[in-house]
From Swiss-Prot:
<dbReference type="InterPro" id="IPR002195">
    <property type="entry name" value="Dihydroorotase_CS"/>
</dbReference>
<protein>
    <recommendedName>
        <fullName>Dihydroorotase</fullName>
        <ecNumber>3.5.2.3</ecNumber>
    </recommendedName>
</protein>
<feature type="modified residue" description="N6-carboxylysine">
    <location>
        <position position="98"/>
    </location>
</feature>
<feature type="binding site">
    <location>
        <position position="245"/>
    </location>
    <ligand>
        <name>Zn(2+) 1</name>
    </ligand>
</feature>
<feature type="binding site">
    <location>
        <position position="175"/>
    </location>
    <ligand>
        <name>Zn(2+) 2</name>
    </ligand>
</feature>
<dbReference type="GO" id="GO:0046872">
    <property type="term" value="F:metal ion binding"/>
</dbReference>
<dbReference type="GO" id="GO:0006221">
    <property type="term" value="P:pyrimidine nucleotide biosynthetic process"/>
</dbReference>
<comment type="similarity">
    <text>Belongs to the metallo-dependent hydrolases superfamily. DHOase family. Class II DHOase subfamily.</text>
</comment>
<dbReference type="Pfam" id="PF01979">
    <property type="entry name" value="Amidohydro_1"/>
</dbReference>
<comment type="pathway">
    <text>Pyrimidine metabolism; UMP biosynthesis via de novo pathway; (S)-dihydroorotate from bicarbonate: step 3/3.</text>
</comment>
<feature type="binding site">
    <location>
        <position position="135"/>
    </location>
    <ligand>
        <name>Zn(2+) 2</name>
    </ligand>
</feature>
<dbReference type="InterPro" id="IPR006680">
    <property type="entry name" value="Amidohydro-rel"/>
</dbReference>
<feature type="binding site" description="via carbamate group">
    <location>
        <position position="98"/>
    </location>
    <ligand>
        <name>Zn(2+) 1</name>
    </ligand>
</feature>
<feature type="binding site" description="via carbamate group">
    <location>
        <position position="98"/>
    </location>
    <ligand>
        <name>Zn(2+) 2</name>
    </ligand>
</feature>
<feature type="binding site">
    <location>
        <position position="17"/>
    </location>
    <ligand>
        <name>Zn(2+) 1</name>
    </ligand>
</feature>
<dbReference type="GO" id="GO:0005737">
    <property type="term" value="C:cytoplasm"/>
</dbReference>
<keyword id="KW-0862">Zinc</keyword>
């Protein structure tokens, strides 16, 4: 008989974007809704979080929106950061520093170009057991033969170099998408971990080319790369764990032509354009990001079951990440376990809970036309599809 119920220790998402303003109001409560009790929050806001004070203020806003969730803060690696600020951040519970190569993803214009410049920062981080979170891609450069399909592989020399210079520094290669990245992390010592997103366990290049809702950075790669991600989860490797990279974008930014170029049946909004510019969001092209927070743990269970790794669910969504970061003994971990129940069919007890909503809309914008770019709404991954597992709520 197949497993019908699973109880797992408190899930933790070690890479999530919770944005600002109305979008943050919409998506922050979704963290708990998706089954997660600890959220490691990215700092690429506008402006980016580069100081302890900014991080504390941001975490306070998030806690006001979702008091039941444990939020862990990070800083944005930039020239503004100093060793003294690192020490201050560590004393105030900020756990990591996120590195973005310049221009490779959302709000990365302040990203870095030369890692050696930051060696004093890394040295101080090593002293305080802080974590360096690496977005592992190089910027596209046609002259150098770099594009989105090999940007991650080309980055790996930087991972090896930083790890070699600072062997005691905890490093996480974020959202790995390639077999090369998986093997690179395995080759490194115990201080190097790796997050894998659920959507990269599902998608390949065919699934995002021409399909904006599945477009993210780094992009999903080839079937063999996806197989490597699945295999390392199935193996239960202790240094690979959940980081959803759940990244909400307004629908207008996933399908920008509908608002910015006057597509048939739409009406561009001047106020909408102003809103996009004011929030630092691109007004052309497709924003990179897949949104999974609201369905995260049931989605992970569904995917892992599909490729024969359901027995590794607890390691993937809770144990491995908490062990790497040192959150395995906190009260959230001890008392935040959740139970999942198998959804037998669409006619089961709670079919609505197993069907992913088509869209989430901020309550204040429910009467705003979809054609208005200022409308705060986000389409989740697998919208309209059925999940194989649901959270049992008391």
């Amino acid at each position: 008989m197949s497993v019908q119920e699973i109880t797992i220790p408190a899930p933790a998402d070690f890479h999530v974007h919770l944005r600002q303003g109305k979008m943050s109001e919409l998506v922050t409560p979704h963290v708990a809704e998706g089954g997660v009790s600890l959220a490691y929050v990215m700092p690429n806001l506008v402006p980016p979080i580069t100081s302890t004070q900014q991080a504390m203020e941001y975490l306070e806003r998030l806690r006001a929106l979702a008091p039941q969730t444990m939020f862990v803060g990070t800083l944005y690696l930039s020239p503004d950061l100093t060793p003294a600020e690192i020490a201050k951040a560590a004393q105030n519970g900020v756990r990591g520093v996120k590195s973005y190569p310049r221009g490779v993803t959302t709000n990365s214009d302040s990203g870095i170009e030369d890692y050696e410049t930051y060696y004093p920062i890394f040295e101080e981080m090593q002293k305080h057991d802080m974590v360096l979170n690496l977005h592992g891609e190089l910027p596209s450069n046609a002259d150098a033969g770099i594009c989105v399909l090999n940007a991650e592989e080309k980055f790996l020399t930087h991972l090896f170099k930083i790890h070699g210079e600072f062997p005691k520094l905890k490093i996480v290669l974020e959202h790995a998408t390639t077999r090369k990245a998986v093997e690179a992390v395995k080759q490194c010592g115990d201080t190097v971990g790796c997050t894998i997103t659920p959507h990269h366990l599902e998608l390949i290049v065919d699934d995002w080319a021409g399909k904006p809702l599945n477009f993210c950075k780094p992009v999903a790669k080839y079937p063999d790369d996806r197989q490597a991600l699945r295999d390392v989860i199935r193996q239960g490797h202790p240094r690979f764990f959940l980081g959803s990279d759940s990244a909400p974008h307004p629908l207008a930014n996933k399908y920008p032509s509908a608002v910015t170029h006057g597509a048939p049946g739409t009406k561009a909004s001047a106020s909408g354009s102003d809103h996009l510019e004011a929030t630092g969001v691109v007004s052309c092209g497709c924003a990179a990001g897949v949104y999974t927070s609201s369905i995260l743990v049931p989605l992970c269970a569904t995917l892992l079951e599909a490729f024969g790794a359901l027995d590794q669910l607890a390691n993937y969504v809770s144990i491995n990440g908490r062990n790497f970061y040192g959150y395995n003994d906190d009260q959230h971990a001890k008392h935040g376990s959740i139970k999942l129940r198998k959804v037998r069919s669409r006619s089961s007890i709670s079919p609505a809970a197993a069907t992913v909503p088509a869209v989430y809309v901020h309550p204040e914008f429910r009467e705003v036309p979809d054609s208005d770019a200022s409308k705060v709404q986000v389409v989740p991954f697998w919208a309209g599809k059925c999940l194989g597992w649901e959270i049992v709520r008391s």
